[in-house]
Design a protein with these regions (language model features):
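Residue-level recognition of short, solvent-exposed, well-ordered loop/turn junctions
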Residues: 23-25, 77, 166, 259, ...
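Mid-domain Rossmann-like dinucleotide-binding core that forms the NAD(H)/NADP(H) cofactor-binding site
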Residues: 138-221, 227
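C-terminal hydrophobic helical "lid"/dimerization subdomain
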Residues: 252-256, 295-352
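Conserved acidic E/D residue at the C-terminus of a beta-strand in Rossmann-like folds
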Residues: 199, 268, 292
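NAD(P)H dinucleotide-binding glycine-rich loop of Rossmann-like/cofactor-binding domains
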Residues: 92-174
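Glycine-rich cofactor phosphate-binding loops and adjacent beta1-alpha1 units
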Residues: 162-166, 206, 211-287, 351-352
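Glycine-rich beta-strand-centered segment in the early N-terminal region that forms part
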Residues: 20-35, 48-97, 137-140
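Short Gly/Pro-enriched turn/cap motifs at secondary-structure boundaries
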Residues: 7, 19-20, 53-59, 111-117, ...
Length: 352
């Protein structure tokens, strides 16, 4: 089958590989229907994730059709259309019982496109299929479902929930990329008074406003942007600052705009250390949270999609075929130039 694989820092390749097979009774084989590209995939190709070995198929977001199940799988059968979570969970280990699926101790957590082969291919082996797959409601679009693999639960769990967004509060989201916009969509569940989007790209800021942001701030001039945010919050700073970029400058920006007793919720994937101003934060009762998504809110988010509370398909800006995946990466890696947010990649090689 065809698959997009990590080769070495700076290089990935679309190659022929063996089709996956059932290895354990709890496995399923899924024919990928649609997938996408995550910013984390770009980090891997850059070499920021050394645990990813050469030859690993990339990708951890997608939907598909079940081709085969192991004898231990009871919730799914051949022909079922499924949402594939970016996180595998055995459901039985110490961390799974606490709902922390990201750290499942039995071939679980974020392993797709990282520690095992991922979804940017014709077929995928899914460990712990009963807990990793979800049945898809008939009235939801493929595009909406793909967004539910990773970015929607990431923005919600790591940004909104860890940030403790609540009615009437002020929220600044740093980065109007896919995760930042996912946080924006799901923050609206809690009716904050102010949703301030911060970015360098005016086009993305306009998109954020169309998605429900109450204010937009261009941060090309940091000091001016900080002043603007304080002016919007009665000189107090924001109650919640969601970092959705993953670079030192944006984390530092969050530290400078957070108000007393506020929470900095870090969603971004950081490849370098950041300065942590604990000497200034402790006396102002500042909370800082981080996290890797567990996707334990996926059932809740599926219900929100079914009731049309949010429309994550609006994040999709570009469409490609699997045979065009190299072009898809070219566009996504230069997202600002192409006004790209999320791309959809459809399997045109092994169609039903």
């Amino acid at each position: 089958m065809k698959a997009y694989t990590y080769v070495k820092p700076g290089l990935a390749s679309f190659v022929d590989v063996d089709k996956p097979v059932i290895r354990k009774p709890t496995d399923a084989i899924v024919r990928i229907v649609k997938t996408t590209i995550c910013g984390t995939d770009l980090h891997i190709i850059k070499g920021d994730v050394p645990a990813c070995q050469s030859g690993t198929i990339l990708g951890h977001e997608g939907i598909g059709i079940v081709e085969e199940v192991g004898e231990g799988v009871s919730n799914f059968k051949k022909g079922d259309k499924v949402l594939i979570s970016c996180v595998c969970a055995c459901g039985k280990c110490y961390y799974c019982k606490k709902g922390i699926y990201a750290h499942c101790e039995d071939e679980g957590g974020w392993i797709f496109g990282h520690l095992i082969d991922g979804m940017q291919a014709e077929y995928l082996r899914v460990p712990h299929a009963d807990n990793t797959l979800y049945h898809t409601p008939e009235d939801l679009s493929d595009e909406a479902l793909v967004m539910l693999s990773d970015i929607l639960p990431t923005g919600y769990e790591i940004g909104v929930l860890k940030g403790k967004v609540e009615p009437g509060c002020s929220v600044a989201i740093i980065g109007s990329g896919p995760v930042g916009l996912a946080a924006l969509l799901t923050a609206q569940f809690y009716s904050p008074a102010k949703l301030i989007m911060v970015d360098l790209d005016d086009n993305r800021l306009e998109t954020a406003v169309s998605f429900g942001a109450t204010h937009k701030v261009n941060s090309s001039d940091h000091e001016k942007a900080i002043k603007e945010i304080y002016d919007l919050t009665d000189r107090r700073g924001v109650d919640v600052a969601i970092e959705a970029v993953g670079i030192p400058a944006t984390f530092d920006f969050c530290q400078k705009i957070i108000g007393v007793d506020g929470t900095v919720a870090n969603c971004g994937v950081h490849g370098k250390p950041v300065e942590f101003d604990l000497d200034k934060l402790w006396i102002r009762n500042i909370n800082v949270t981080t996290g890797l998504v567990s996707t334990n809110t996926t059932p809740q988010l599926l219900k929100a999609l079914e009731s049309h509370k949010i429309e994550p398909e609006k994040l999709v800006t570009h469409y490609f075929k699997l045979s065009e995946i190299e072009k898809a990466y070219e566009v996504f890696s230069k997202a600002a130039d192409h006004h790209a947010i999320k791309v959809i990649i459809e399997n045109d090689i092994s169609e039903a």
